[in-house]
């Protein structure tokens, strides 16, 4: 398997998967792990922000966030707004990859989204995008 490089040397790149669908989280996390990444999971935006705060206390930061937009609780757009408000002083800038059924790139560009993947998607295509941001 292709072993991507991490901008935080000595560790596998962390990829935070934020999606309310357990089947998607499981499939994506499994593929990421097989490809040499350390997947972390959250079911919605507030859980993702809590994970990031806890990980930051340990000096751990995701290199990439794979984010669903339509979730119960804090959705993807609100998560992006909160993350953007906290700024780079709180977290190094991870690459934001939105995974959505309805691609609307106009509202995402101002919130730091680097790439949009439209559902349904092939796992190999998702891994190619993740590799692009971690090598």
Feature names for model-found ranges:
Residues 18-19, 42, 65, 99-100:
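Conserved sequence signature across two-component system core domains
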Residues 50, 77-91:
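Short amphipathic alpha-helix used as the core "switch/output" element in two-component signaling
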Residues 41-54, 76:
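Helix N-cap/capping motif at the beta->alpha junctions
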Residues 1-16, 22, 26, 57-59, ...:
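Non-catalytic signal-transmission and effector/linker regions of two-component phosphorelay proteins
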Residues 68:
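Active-site residues of response regulator receiver
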Residues 26-34:
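Charged docking surfaces used in two-component/phosphorelay signaling
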Residues 78, 91-94, 101-118, 124, ...:
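Alpha4 helix (beta4-alpha4-beta5 surface) of REC/receiver domains from two-component response regulators
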Residues 71:
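Receiver (REC) domain active-site loop signature in two-component systems and cognate sites
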């Amino acid at each position: 398997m292709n072993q991507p490089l991490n901008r935080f040397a000595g560790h596998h790149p962390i990829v935070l998967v934020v999606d309310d669908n357990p089947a998607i989280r499981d499939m994506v996390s499994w593929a990421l792990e097989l490809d040499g990444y350390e997947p972390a999971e959250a079911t919605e935006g507030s859980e993702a922000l809590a994970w990031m705060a806890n990980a930051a206390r340990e000096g751990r930061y995701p290199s990439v966030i794979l984010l669903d937009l339509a979730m119960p609780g804090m959705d993807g757009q609100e998560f992006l707004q909160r993350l953007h408000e906290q700024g780079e002083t709180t977290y190094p800038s991870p690459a934001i990859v939105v995974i959505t059924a309805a691609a609307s790139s106009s509202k995402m560009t101002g919130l730091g989204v680097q790439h949009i993947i439209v559902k349904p998607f092939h796992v190999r295509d998702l891994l190619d995008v993740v590799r692009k941001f971690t090598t």
